[in-house]
Amino acid sequence: MASSMLEHDYRQLALLSRKASASSGLTSFIWSSNNAKEGEEIKDSAERVLLLLRNSTSTTATTTTTNERRIDSETMLAPVRLSCQSRRPELVGQALGIVQKLVGMSEEGWCTAADVHTVLGLLQSVEAVYDESVQLKILQTCLVVLQSPRLHPRNAETILSLVSLCFRAMTPRGKGQV
């Protein structure tokens, strides 16, 4: 069940990046050829994770749940990282949704305590995307990390970074704001 939810999210990410790199008109003017290459990289990386997820669910019943579900976190987070670097709100929003699910399913071995700093870095990298849905995803992801019994940050510096990220995401950014 969990891997099917992840498969769906990675499929959506691949679809969004494919649309972004193949679109025409004003969007393609804004989404330059260099960014179109980024879109292809995101799509390829997401499809690579999809293949790994499908293979992990089709393994034999003799493997343990942890081995069955444990795919290298670098590989799992590669399309997420590329999407966050693109700064496109729809890609960033989908990527943060994937991060939320990975963190939420940490009990099943999808995300480990070592990945908290990676997640924090991703959240800080997309903080400047001023789309309201992205800001909401940042807040939700911080909450999921703080509530996770397995991933709850152990040191004060990480907790402070997460809480300050929440406050910055909640700060209104209008014309009068600097």
Model-predicted segments: where are they?
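Eukaryotic helix-linker segments that join adjacent hydrophobic helices
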Residues: 49-53, 59-61, 71, 95, ...
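N-terminal alpha-helical scaffolding segments that mark the starts
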Residues: 1-59, 65-69
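Helix-loop junctions that connect tandem helical modules in alpha-solenoid scaffolds
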Residues: 19-38, 79-88, 105-107, 121-131, ...
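Core helices of alpha-solenoid repeat scaffolds
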Residues: 10, 69-80, 112-121, 135, ...
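Residue-level signature of alpha-solenoid helical repeat scaffolds
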Residues: 48, 97-98, 140-144, 164, ...
